Amino acid sequence: SILENIIYSTKNISFEKVVDAAKAVGVHDYIMELPNKYETQLEQRGENLSIGQRQLISFARAIVRDSKIIILDEATANIDSYTEMQIQNALKVLLEGRTALVIAHRLATIRGADKIIVLQNGEIIEQDTHENLIKNKGLYYSLSSLNYSSFDDIPDHIIKKITGESSST
């Protein structure tokens, strides 16, 4: 069930804390619309939920567990703009006071990070806050100034121009 998923490997947690966590990440109202609410059975790997709903439920689980370290790999990949906004809001709650390693192509996902590390060909080429990386006008600035929501949306020829890679193959 959704409840079992949220409290997975957590002992002695009250239902009230589960509801508080679900509300904090914005998934409670959705759960309450389901016929069996928190007792709704989930299919294998949550197949009967959208990607965004699965993300939000996993965020609620991390809050219930009081996880101190969070690892997110493309938390906002393969979702629509509305769901991305929900997840961005949930991330603010989830990451507050926690250490996080966030792998992201969408700049909005990492904008509020204490430190952003920019990799190119597996090497660190920049690291700082969003504001300082913008001021430094390096690769991060170039990519963000293109106003793409995702690095994946940027055509290869533009990336090659920004990074100075040769256009010929």
Regions found by a protein language model. Name each.
Residues I70-E74:
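Catalytic Walker B motif of ABC-type/P-loop ATPase nucleotide-binding domains
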Residues Q86-L94, R106:
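Conserved helical "switch/dimer-interface" subregion of ABC/ABC-like ATPase nucleotide-binding domains
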Residues R65, E96:
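Conserved signature/switch motifs of ABC ATPase nucleotide-binding domains
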Residues L3-Q44, Q88, G97:
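ABC ATPase nucleotide-binding domain helical subdomain, centered on the C-loop/LSGGQ "ABC signature"
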Residues A24, E33-K37, N89, R111-T169:
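C-terminal portion of ABC ATPase nucleotide-binding domains
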Residues S81-Y82:
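Helix N-cap at the start of a conserved alpha-helix in ABC-type nucleotide-binding domains
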Residues F59, I103:
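Hydrophobic anchor residue at the start of the ABC signature
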